[in-house]
Amino acid sequence: MRIHYIVRPLALFCIMLYTVSAVSSDKYRWTDELVLLRAIDRLPEYRDGCHVEQFSSYDRTWGNDDGFSGKYSYLRKENGGLVIAEMEGAGVINRIWTPTPNDNMLSFYFDGKSEPGLRIRFSDLFSGKVFPFVSPLCGNEVGGFYCYLPITYARSCKIVMEGEGLQFIQIQYRRLPGMKVETYDGTFTDADRTLLDEVCRAWSAARPDAMAFAQGRSSGASVSEKTVTLSPGDGSVVFESGSPGRITGIELDGGNAFEGNDRNVILTARWDNDSTDAICAPVADFFGYAYGRPAMRGMLMGRSGYTNYCYLP
């Protein structure tokens, strides 16, 4: 079993974080949001001064018509189109999801302008054919069609679909009050293209690698490796540290020992002399097995080959 971790003075870290945040005065671009899609080291960071909200086709009567009829899939009809979302104030669209895309055109009207700043077929948000809406940030898997490409706006955004109908839809956005946000304009520098390519490579990595995320606040990671043999009823401490820091990755190679329905090997962890476990789960459950077999292989958690991995910091 391999544990990737870092040890560092957390007080200094907090001071550095505050200083960087306080002195930033540049406009917030879509690429500032894009870089967060690979900044796994920042997952534990609390966000303040923003609000995550969503437009969706949920049944306003709390029934089961969450998009089947299309009755709740838009806010209003306007000039022959359907207004499906309308956001006031600075913000960023983080996610668009649907299981039922169509080829109707979408128009994104930014900052109260009468002409759209972005026009694209609804289906091309997910097809991977239109830059920068490329795979794997945009695509379709079990569960529907998704787009995680950030779309920023300085003052407002209205999304209008041309056509008569729409079914299931979710549009998730984050309001950024008081921030100087640069509106997405569809122009891209060489640096923008390079960053997008780097994020796409991180999302599509063929093999999990903890050191790929040992950057930023997770840089300087060390590795602790231990081999254990467990008999029924036994337990073994595989990692222990008496200094502040963070675990940046857990890799556990157990062959096929965790397969099957028994789920009788338990992983536990606790921090800071707590009397209660922060983690207490069957190994199989922790790494995403289902019905006794490996069932998950994501960027941050799952199983690849015989390696069970978790890179949540």
Model-inferred region functions:
Residues V23-P313:
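Beta-strand-centric surfaces of beta-sandwich/beta-rich domains
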